[in-house]
Amino acid sequence: RADYEAGAMSAEELKKTEDKAITELVAKQKEAGYHVITDGEFRRATWHLDFMWAFDGVGHSKTETGLPFHGEAAMIDDTYVTGKISYKKNHSFVEHFKFVKTLEDENTVAKLTIPAPAQFLEQMIMPFAWSNTKKFYDTQEEVAKDIAEGYREFIKEVYAAGCRNLQLDDCSWGMVVDPAACKLFGVTPKGLEKIKEQLLEINNSALEGKPEDLIVNTHVCRGNFHSTYA
């Protein structure tokens, strides 16, 4: 990917390299006895932000300061609102999933991992982001409404592509129970309770109307960048 970003590799060459690496990875998963297979997120720059970048109304640029993790700044792209957030059809993650789907067999099911709606919302309402987000939204509830609608559209599209196992990766819960949570979010204890409710509500709203045979699970952690955490 570094070669691609430096202009030393074409998009076609990058995809061939990714396809080969993912095929080898899935073979190892099967050898280990896994019944659920994934692409290891090999096509992404980060585990979560690439998903957001594919939405209308979301932009990103090379960071100068990074995000403060414990002991180190995570030097990942700044990601921010550029307009009203909405789902853009033909999301790249749907294509990513389709490739893994071709590697299924009678013993395995392809799973797609994406950031949870709460994670998306948190990215846009934390103090470092809200001053920009409020140029386009009057309230955080309006942001949540648009994000949830976008997720519902994405779920329809990836389900139509054959996805029956979707994982929501969510670092937001570890942050809201941190002893320093009020400082992190720039709120009072009462304000923090409101944020917790918002995170719960957006996750539930995004899943409204999902197909009954779509399995949705979640993974909760504090993030990972060079083995440090948010």
What is each residue range found by the language model?
Residues 1-230:
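Domain-level signal for soluble alpha/beta catalytic cores
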